[in-house]
Amino acid sequence: QWLITQHGRVALPDPSSTQGRVVRRAIGVDDGTHTWPVPPELLNAFAELPPLNFPAQPPEVVDTGQGLWARTPDGVAELTPTQAQMLIGLGAKTAASTAQEIAALADVPLNLNLPSTTFRFVSPDEGWMCAGNEGGGVVVPAQAGTVALAGEAVAHRFGGLNTGGVGVDSGHGYHVVAPTGQRHEVKDKETLEALGTGVGARVPWEILRLLPEGSALSREQALQVSS
């Protein structure tokens, strides 16, 4: 399972493991949380974030009444309530201290990478899950006027082009995307310029490849598709 946020995706620990249960409880996953089925092609459109990482030995979790800290023999590092909950769930001992006592200790980096907050998880009732241009997850309201995609494609529906096609630079080549949602490879940027579309959009290949592939177009064929 993966956690997809506005920043990208990160793998969650095995749900049957202690770490997996601790992480899910802390970030707000429960029996009512919807799990989205995501094919590998769409999953790869989300930016992969650094993996979650717990310290080999849980540090002591210290509460000053003004903040939470992880304390080791070398010093302290600030924690969020969510991170503290995870560490305690893995057996970290707790202690009370004062802000003055913590201020006297050195700041040290911790060998951990854990979510800093809980999340509000969305369901299909709230819209469609999409991958944004920067690799983050986006939920957009279901939109009227979309068309079902023909042929073999990971994406199911397409919208946004009422009339005419658009020239697209994927970073791996140039395409014309037709109003039907099919993508057609063209030879070069000059072909798009000759069509009058130019590069109307820059779309990462990881997203563009989710559309059904049409035949490669010559300049004459591309003129027909974009008209």
Each model region followed by its residue ranges:
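Short, surface-exposed polybasic-aromatic patches that bind anionic ligands, especially phosphate groups
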Residues: 1-227
